[in-house]
Amino acid sequence: MGINGYRSDDTQALRAMADSLASLTDDLRHEDPEKALQNLIGRGGQELVEARWASITVLRGGTFRTIASTAPTADGVDRLQYEFGAGPCVDAVLEDTMYLTGDVTAEERWRPLGERLSAAYGVRSMLAYRLHLLDESATIAGLNFSSDQLDAFSPADVQRGKVLATHCALLVSASLARDKATNLFKALQSNREIGVAVGVLMAHHQLTRDQAFDLLRLASQRTNRKLADIAGEVAETGADPFDFGPEAVPLS
């Protein structure tokens, strides 16, 4: 027997799987985040022989959503749990634990959800993990597997799932960090362009800072366009935001 009661060949298989997933994760880091996560859970999930569907759940701002899945059925299974506010994928995320059931219809805590999952999607077995992200200040996440077979997931599958969950957590963390950096850059870029546009209008029309900003805001309202977009054009071309003079600016 090997460590934790596993045979040495089981341990070697887990190590081989971990090495393979590490290489795959490195390859996927620069792909589109959604596609990368789908590839990871699709290929990694093949290690769990009886797993029919897999998905990744995130909870942000009090709202659950699925950011990657291997099939529309997986999305439906998640969505039904979100509607109930319970189920393996929801509870694993909220309670920071793993949930395994060999027959979701027999679980008292998830009635009548279990019957609904079985009737709508044929689901019987479910396995869900909380993903431990590098930054959980705004988002937490989980990895979910489901099967149409009873008692589908073996102890070895549970260990394989833990290995996959580790790599999914890294990839989700990288994706969220990229999104955060992108949003921060966009915000900084917008603020910079608004500042430049305000300066241009102040110089061209001898306006105060507040009057110049009001001109941009008024143009945004009248043209139904984002203020940042109008500011970008003014900053780039030096043109007025629309064809009326500074006398139209509310002076207060």
PLM segments and residue spans:
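Intrinsically disordered, low-complexity terminal regulatory regions
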Residues: 1-72, 234-252
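Short glycine-/small-residue motifs
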Residues: 139-143
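The cytosolic transmitter module of two-component sensor histidine kinases
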Residues: 17, 33-37, 85, 157, ...
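Interdomain signal-transducing alpha-helices
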Residues: 44, 92, 117, 135, ...
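Regulatory sensory and allosteric helical modules in signal-transduction proteins
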Residues: 58-59, 74-111, 115-119, 124
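A short, aliphatic-rich beta-strand micro-motif
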Residues: 124-134
